[in-house]
Amino acid sequence: MKKTFIILCLLVMCLMTIAQTPCPQVIPALQEWKGAKGTLCLPAQGSIVINPSDEAALTKTASTLVEDLKELMGWEYTITTGKAKKNDIYLSLSQPDEQLGKEGYTLSIMNKVSIEAPTTQGVFWGTRTLLQMLHHQKAKLAKGTTRDWPEFPNRGFMLDVGRKFFTLDYLKEQIKVLSFYKMNEFQIHLNDNGFPQFFDNDWNQTYAAFRLESERFPGLTAKDGSYTKKEFTELQRMGMEYGVNIIPEIDIPAHSLAFAHYKPEIGSKEYGMDHLDLYKEETYQFVDALLDEYLSGEEPVFIGPDVHIGTDEYNKKEAEQYRYFTDRYLKYVASYGKTPRMWGGLKWLPGKTPVQAEGVTVNAWSFDWVDPEISIQEGYKLINTCDTYLYIVPGAGYYREFLDHQWLYEKWTPWMMNRKQTLPVGTPGVLGGMFAVWNDQCGNGISQQDVHYRSFPAIQVMAERMWKGDNQQTVPFAEFEALCKTMPEAPGVNLLGRIGEETSLLTEEATLNGKESIETSLQEVGYPYTVSFSICPEEKPNISGVLFKGPHSTVYTNWENTGRIAFTRDGYEFAFGSFILPVGQWTDITIKGDWKGTSLYVNGKLQERLEGRKKRVYNPKYNRLESMPIQETLVFPLQYIGDNINGFKGKLKNVKVLQE
């Protein structure tokens, strides 16, 4: 009897196991999943139903979900209020839940989809999970219930837009990407400068930029790319709608050459013009007025809860005055009701002058510059931004081109503050982590999409580690990496230029008269790719005639009347200098691109590779030669063949695109 009972129990357990659906594959992985039997097939036309009492709080979330379902699935959904029916998507706020906190949610898939959370933020995160499930499972959703919440409250990405301009559209797409992976902070580093050795060792010629419109200081704003106050405020509002806190950073008193260019008298004569002079009253008057311009008034420009004042890498000789300056501006920002943030620097600049700690958040970025244990003892809140593990500096040759995704996935946690200090799990004051992209090499040719190629996989793995926390890995890294490669960047975002299968854009011969274009089915193709075509230019081609054009780049023939093939993007120009395209005859051209460079093949043979060119300079500070590698890359434009104003004149055929 006992043996029979045991066998029956085992059979029941097996049947239960078979009946339960496996945990859906999403990034970050779910904290809990209780599978049920069967699947739910959502219709292509359906309803998002909001609990009537939550209509005001959840209508924007529902509207965003409608847009995303259209982008991701091609579905048409409408928004209603009331009681949900079969196959509906139901959104509702629930009672406070200590485990779910401010960002957690419950998602149930039975005869309908129900997303409930104590906060609007939690409901929104639930919609991101649903979208990822739909991407993998299409209309057939595995039934079950998840309770999901983040292990760390602050999960972020910092982008240096001071040394390299990024368009407003790019920043908006980054918000969508971060949100899709439940990363909730986007720090925008608004001012910085290059290294003088690359600009004839002349501070007056050294590149520097401040990216915000300023009415108090006309002429301060960078001329090669900036954001109006209205644009930046709207960007922050968009971030709030997507659950992403935009953290503006105005970096002072170092990295401040843009301000010294505008007002030379506040630049330091002793330590370099990128350092503000901490002993001049004019310096404080300027910084007071600059910060006040964005923090004051009934409708301030900076509308979020946090404002970053930089404070990193000032000369060590001025520790006491630096500490006074830092203390002053932490309190100054706090006086406007904001939470001030700073880069850690008090270990490198120790002294007797007290620096405000209460209510201050510190990016713990360097073992040499910040002591996390002492910082927490003093009352600072910390965000792990360890340079050793979490810095990307494209094309520099120091720090990283790509984060070590496998090591981060398998080993890293936000408790690992630097290469020598790991805090005990659960240490109060550690808020989470943030990785950073620094564009130190001003003018090195790097593109927005080059940066995204590096940052996107980092977003995926950092999202996983900071949401999931110290909980056991869901799958081995190889499986996680494979999952990452199948995931979209976000609904409606394709900065990587993914195209899927090989595509023929133009099979039959086309003749273009220089004033017309052909729109194709693709926008662009990203790394690594091969684009091939046969081309026969007219005897008198247009000068710099557009051959291919896309949202971010353009390819030309007869560049500057030289007969060469060239391309432009991000304000840079690149030409294949070793080949002149013959007119009046057919030539087979192939262009291959990857994240390191771009190759031109002519009639099946490699003609030229754009990679490895360097700008070489002398650095008198260290008495050594230095070099800056130039990034000659191209995400190939495909949206239009030809141009309606100044296009290619001639014949074209056999346009094929392959992405590896």
What is the predicted role of each segment?
Residues 48, 69, 119, 157, ...:
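Conserved, mostly hydrophobic/aromatic
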Residues 19-150, 340-349, 356, 493:
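Acidic, contiguous N-terminal accessory segments
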Residues 1-24:
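Bacterial Sec-dependent N-terminal signal peptides
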Residues 355-360, 367-509:
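Flexible, acidic glycine-rich loops studded with aromatic residues
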Residues 98-274, 282, 291-306, 439-441:
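Feature activates predominantly on carbohydrate-active enzymes
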Residues 259-361, 365-379:
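Active-site neighborhood of glycoside hydrolase catalytic domains
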Residues 155-159, 186-188, 246-250, 307-309, ...:
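Hydrophobic faces of well-ordered beta-strands that scaffold small-molecule active sites
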Residues 499-660:
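Extracellular glycan-associated modules
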